[in-house]
Amino acid sequence: MSLKIGNEAEDKASSYLQKEGYAILERNFHSKFGEIDIIAKKENILHFCEVKFSQNYDPITRITSSKMNKIIKTINYYLLTHAHSCDYQIDAILVTPENIEIIKNISY
């Protein structure tokens, strides 16, 4: 996915989350292990969000076990370097031209 399309999908996802009552804490958090697209908080739960965009197939298929391992390592790094004492979950935000869908608490 091009950088422009990826940024637009993340912008849409961030706006959607804010409308749903989430506070956006960070976007594009990088570590040597990988990147978290959006880190948000709602009701004292941290949400580590992976945003996927697709025009012609189900975007969830692009979250592989390898990608999940990178996300988990990056989350662990984030939690070590930031003072948060709350529960967390990994969410997928699937963006298509017609829809935004959140799949909460994903695993692989």
Please report, for each region that a protein language model flagged, where it lies by residue.
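A generic structural signal for short beta-strands and their flanking turns/coil linkers
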Residues: 32-34, 47, 86-88
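Short, well-ordered amphipathic alpha-helical segments that serve as non-catalytic structural scaffolds
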Residues: 74-75
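Short, conserved glycine- and acidic-residue-centered signature motifs
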Residues: 6, 10, 63-68
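Acidic-basic catalytic patches of nuclease active cores, encompassing PD-(D/E)XK
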Residues: 1-27
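Domain-level recognition of nuclease-like catalytic cores that cleave nucleotide substrates
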Residues: 82, 86-108
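Catalytic phosphate/metal-binding cores of nucleic-acid and nucleotide-processing enzymes, i.e., regions
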Residues: 18, 61, 78-80
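Active-site metal-binding core of divalent-cation-utilizing nuclease and nuclease-like domains
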Residues: 23-43, 98
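Conserved catalytic cores of phosphodiester-cleaving nucleases, focusing on short active-site segments
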Residues: 36-59, 71
